[in-house]
């Protein structure tokens, strides 16, 4: 989200009507776990005796607080339901306090996955963005860059209307991803048609130190102050917009999140910086990720 222009009241109300049970939907924490008979499991398998597994449809974690897919020998300590982050969004001229809470995680495990369901959902809170609200709370959805269905270059994403808000020109994708500094220069030719399409297995992204995502704020969540402002077009989110999206990088070693907000009409490279804030409550004292 950024300070720019007004999001239409009509759009917000229409989305709210279509999602009248949104609170119930997005407060449930779940992950998709493959069944024991699924023959498409990757060749590496988690050792269940060595780690606790976060069960589908529950809000419980094991004593070691390791959030693990049954099909992967990997802990996802900093990408799991219930985790909260705190930090800031800043630019040359602005600074805002930001809070993020992860509600659901549903990562793609298979190379042939074609689901368009968001891989991550949660709430995004930004404070003192507008002169009429102390804070603005939105629901965001996100997709992981898995180098197959969702590569770095969004022009190669599925041509689906639901994904249009994540789209950007090749040059914009390249200039933003390069700011993270974790890629070799050989991967960044703007003239190559297959920019960003690496020869990775779909689940390989989980075994890397850095997980890359795109986050998109979809609509406002119910809030007493925000609801009252919807009655007045002249004041509703005056000076603010969440029409753009974020390029995001999660460091699996430290849990830190770095991101950049993008919209063609906004100041470029507004930086998002977050760190986990409730690790004690979830017993996540350190990451299980190891650098090979």
Curated annotation (Swiss-Prot):
* InterPro entries per record: Vacuolar_import/degrad_Vid24
- Superkingdom per UniProt: Eukaryota
Q: Which GO terms describe its biological process?
A: negative regulation of gluconeogenesis; proteasome-mediated ubiquitin-dependent protein catabolic process; protein catabolic process; protein catabolic process in the vacuole; protein targeting to vacuole; response to osmotic stress; response to starvation
Which positions, given as ranges, span the membrane? Answer: none
**Gene Ontology CC, one term:** vacuole
The protein's assembly and partners = Substrate-recognition component of the GID/CTLH ubiquitin ligase complex. In the absence of stress, the complex exists as an inactive anticipatory complex (GID(Ant)), composed of VID30/GID1, the E3 ubiquitin-ligase RMD5/GID2, VID28/GID5, GID8, and the RING-like subunit FYV10/GID9, awaiting a substrate receptor to form the active E3 ligase complex. When cells are shifted to glucose-containing medium, the substrate receptor VID24/GID4 is induced and becomes part of the complex, named GID(SR4).
Protein family: Belongs to the GID4/VID24 family.
Function comment: Substrate-recognition component of the GID E3 ligase complex recruiting N termini and catalyzing ubiquitination of proteins targeted for degradation. GID E3 is regulated through assembly with interchangeable N-degron-binding substrate receptors induced by distinct environmental perturbations. Required for the adaptation to osmotic or heat stress. Required for the regulation of protein levels of the adapter protein ART2, a component of the ART-Rsp5 ubiquitin ligase pathway, part of the plasma membrane quality control.
Protein name stated in the entry: GID complex substrate-recognition subunit 10
Q: Which organism is it from?
A: Saccharomyces cerevisiae (strain ATCC 204508 / S288c) (Baker's yeast)
